[in-house]
Amino acid sequence: MIRAAIFDIDGTLAMMHKDTGTYAALPGAVETVKALSARMPVVAYTNGTFFPPAHYYPLLADAGLHLKPGHILTPAAVAARQLVAKGYKRLLVLGADGTRVPLRDAGIEVAIPGDEGPFDAVMIGWMKDFGAKDLEHAAQALWGGLPLYATSVAPHFAGAKGRLLGISGAIAAALQNATCVTPTVFGKPEVIGLLDIAAMLNIPPEDMVVIGDDPALEIAMARKAGAFAVGVTTGTASAEGFASAPEPLRAHVTLPDLAGLLSQGWW
């Protein structure tokens, strides 16, 4: 029985206009979120770290998408919980406020390239402006033996004008190429974020539906965790793209948009 609904944001619920940093809801999203929220917990779990979690609420509300407090999750928030549990106190962070704020809120000191060590690890998130000196500083820390973490290594995500580059993945790839250090990833398709949601709601993944636009991210995460997976073709992938995924990681259902989600017979 489905007892909770987990939605991706970009390409599933809404599209971001990069120039303005605002969202526009996708077809059926507003009505679906409103109707489902009256029936069960609804959580938005994005792979993005453009903003701290708290900043997403008014942006999505402006697009007509209203989520309850504590029901928007980013991989930076997942990372913060996990790294505190590891006992980390100070991180070298290549990332903007979307990564820094959750870490600070969790009690971790955030250092940036140019700051003196020691650091416990290197953490990568989305950032708009970075250069060779930032990469060099992080590489030196990794050559010194520190572990590498990333919020997401997705190559791209859906935007209002087409695909947008996954900056954190690009930075991680550059550092891995230079240092041969493989990042530990907290975002989708890793299941740790979905397990955090399961713990928060006290609902196992087997009783959740996960809806997303990327077969390699939220759909793969859902299948690995045992959740029911629904793909929508409003973002990065076509129906053929969903169908071509290997069966163990393939969406159970693929829809053209969210407008027909509530009429499905598997609820």
Where are these regions (language model features)?
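Asp-based, Mg2+/Mn2+-dependent phosphohydrolase catalytic module
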Residues: 1-9, 13-35, 54-73, 80-267
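Canonical radical SAM enzyme core domain
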Residues: 49-52
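Conserved phosphate-coupling serine/threonine residues in phosphotransfer and NTP-handling enzymes
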Residues: 46
